[in-house]
């Protein structure tokens, strides 16, 4: 089954909502995350798990490939291009490959806020 596209503004709003619901429900409300794992997490933990997944779209793997650039070798191997990160309009739900316009620094730039939030969360 193919997943639908990943849009940063919608995902960001979902993350914020999960954190607010956790503020209200605390550890009394837990859901399975990831689905099918049998692992129960509170909503704050789920928000951070989803946030880390969104951040990974931009991180290089062991071969230097970033999911946001798909299979384009230019961005993985060329020394002049490998550190260029494009902020696509939306992303493929299964692969993380960037789709649509690649100059969406506005809403896709929310990844910077996610990185800051995750760094703070990890240091607690």
Predicted features along the sequence, with ranges:
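Acidic, mature catalytic/reactive cores of soluble proteins
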Residues: 1-124
């Amino acid at each position: 089954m193919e997943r639908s596209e990943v849009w940063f503004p919608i995902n960001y709003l979902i993350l914020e909502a999960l954190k607010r619901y956790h503020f209200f429900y605390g550890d009394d409300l837990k859901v399975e995350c990831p689905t099918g794992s049998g692992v129960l997490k509170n909503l704050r933990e789920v928000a951070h798990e989803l946030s880390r997944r969104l951040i990974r779209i931009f991180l290089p793997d062991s071969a230097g490939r970033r999911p946001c650039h798909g299979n384009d070798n230019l961005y993985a191997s060329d020394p002049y291009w490998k550190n260029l990160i494009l902020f696509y309009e939306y992303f493929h739900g299964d692969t993380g490959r960037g789709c649509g316009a690649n100059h969406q620094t506005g809403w896709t730039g929310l990844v910077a806020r996610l990185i800051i939030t995750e760094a703070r969360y990890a240091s607690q």
